[in-house]
Structure formats: C-alpha cells, structure tokens
C-alpha cells in the first residue's frame, strides 16, 4: 500500500498542505522545529487516529484553529481508499470513501504505518508503560479484535478502579458489584493476553531474523511476555487465562479495595527483550539497543505483511543520523522495494545514496512544503 496524496489543515504548525508523494522514497529536509516531525505525525494520525507524541488530540489543533482536518488517498493492491479524520475540541470523526464510520475500530487498519524515531530506544530501556502502549498501538492497527478488546479493557478498568476508590472511602458497600466488574474485566483481559502472546511470538521470530541481518553477529534476539499474573503461560487457553486472572482478583480483593486500584492484569504486564537470554535493558550496549529497536520496527513490517498481505508505510523521523552506515544499509536493503518510506532529516549528508535511488526530496520551512528534487 502507499499514500499518494495528503491534505492537511491546521495540524500543529501545518496550516494548509496538499502534497503528492512518491510510492517509494520521500525525503523531507529542513531545520529543527519547521514541521518535519509534524508531517510524519499527521500521516501516523491519519492511519491510527492517535498520536505517538501526545495523548490529547486537542494538542494537535493548530494555534487559533477550531479544528484539524486530515485527508489521504491510499492505493492498496485490491482497492483505492479516500480516508479522512476530523479533530475538533469535542472529539474526532473518521470517514472511509466519504462514509462516516460510527466506530474507530472500523477505520483503524485501513492504512498501516510503522514509525521509527530516536525515542524508540526507550522501548528497550524505558518504563513498562511504554512497552504496553507499543503493543496496544501496533497490534491494534493490524487486528480489529485486539483493538476492540484493548479499548473495552480500558473502559471496564476505569469503571472498576472508580468503584474500588468508592469502596476504599466508604462511599460504597456492595462488593457483589465489584465481583461483577472483576469477572467482566477478567474475561476481556484473557482475550487481550491471549492475543499478545500470539502476536509477540510472530514478532519475536521476525525480530530475531532482522537482528541477525543488522548486527551480523552471533547473538540471538528474543522477546518474552511477562504477565503480572505470573502463572499464566503462552500455552493457556483464553478460558484458563480468564480463570487465573479472576483467581488473582479474588485473592487480592482486600488489597485492591485498600489501595483503590486493580493490582494485576494486562495494564501491569511487561515485555522483555533478550540477547542470548540476557535482559537487553540491563546488559545491552547502546549500539545493541539501537539494533534491537531497529529490528523490532523491521519485524513489525513483516508482521503487518503477514496479517494483511500489504506492506505498511514506514516513517523514519530523524533516525538516519542516529544510524551508522552499516545499520543504514541494513535498514534500507531490508525495506527496498517493499515499503513506501518517509524520511525526515536536517540535511542530506550521511544518506546512503547508493541504496536510496531516485527519491523525491521536499524542503520544509515554517510549516510549508516545497518540492526540491523530483526523482
């Protein structure tokens, strides 16, 4: 799949843009704070209806603006799509081929995009919440069921935690209602965890292959999922996972009431990246961590292709300068002829021109884009 046209109105500092893209490689050059990252964020939002930089959609509406409008023309192997997202201060709406969608889950997945930025190193060395967000965003865009269960889990979790707080403060007494919420949450959690195990198995396989390709070394990369309910295993059925989570909720009921929060479940789970069985967070060098982060992104590309039969867009936000020539070459060779790629950079030095042949180059300044070089 590829995005051949993008329209942007009032997205951060991008006031009004109409841009045609090359189906292969598009490079955007410009100084910092001119709008390069905002452009990739706009494409990412068009695909996933959420930002990788903020949890508040209001932050995306340009200064003095009342709304943000994004529209894209997408070419897929079997179909052509017109996608649109409208963000207002009251919320957001989405359209597919000019038909408004009642649910975001019907929209997400029409356009797949994988983003790689310098912040992705935090995926290996950062907090568990970053890795959980990674799973929900990346798996949600390729599987509608995962997206549904992740959204439903958040809703019921908030409801249960609010009720736990009422119990903790003595404003509620009925623990039967708490049991109902725990049972409902355990059922949704089981569906979510089952799918996480499944997707991480695929991702680990592809990431291991990609790491070998990038590092040219003998180390083996693997990904392990660590449920907060420790007796859950990858071989469990959804019914077995449900029962184990419900047992955990029941065992910890008094503690949860006292703390006013749910102490176990998918919102407390984590994933671990290992090199030869050792925790990469603790033992990997910065170069190894960079290779792991890159391998995960390449694995995502393969996972999207496996599950959708389409290659996603690849958004490289100021990462080429972070990669040495060997890693650049490995990345570009890996994606060559597969993905439509968008690259932002402050200058063209350091780009592996022997691999990137005939890109379309744009210049970005103060939120406006001009075509600098046609391929």
From Swiss-Prot:
What InterPro entries does the entry give?
Answer: DNA-binding_RecF (IPR001238), DNA-binding_RecF_CS (IPR018078), P-loop_NTPase (IPR027417), RecF/RecN/SMC_N (IPR003395), RecF_2 (IPR042174)
An example molecular function term from Gene Ontology annotations: ATP binding
**Where do the annotations place ATP binding?**
30-37
List UniProt keywords, sorted A-Z: ATP-binding, Cytoplasm, DNA damage, DNA repair, DNA replication, DNA-binding, Nucleotide-binding, SOS response
Claim: Transferase is one of the keywords in the record = no
Write down the SUPFAM superfamilies for this protein, in alphabetical order: P-loop containing nucleoside triphosphate hydrolases
Compartments reported by the entry: Cytoplasm
Q: List the GO cellular component terms.
A: cytoplasm
Could you tell me the superkingdom of the organism this chain comes from?
Bacteria
Gene3D superfamilies with a match to the protein in the record: P-loop containing nucleotide triphosphate hydrolases, RecF/RecN/SMC, N-terminal domain
For this protein, the record's Pfam families field holds: SMC_N
Give any single GO term for biological process: DNA replication
Q: Which residues form a coiled coil?
A: none
Family annotation (PROSITE patterns)? RECF_1, RECF_2
Primary site of residence: cytoplasm
Q: Which family does it belong to?
A: Belongs to the RecF family.
Question: What is the recorded function of this protein according to its Swiss-Prot or TrEMBL entry?
Answer: The RecF protein is involved in DNA metabolism; it is required for DNA replication and normal SOS inducibility. RecF binds preferentially to single-stranded, linear DNA. It also seems to bind ATP.
What PANTHER family has UniProt attached to this entry? DNA REPLICATION AND REPAIR PROTEIN RECF
- Provide the protein name: DNA replication and repair protein RecF
Please name the source species: Lactobacillus acidophilus (strain ATCC 700396 / NCK56 / N2 / NCFM)
Q: Which gene encodes it?
A: recF
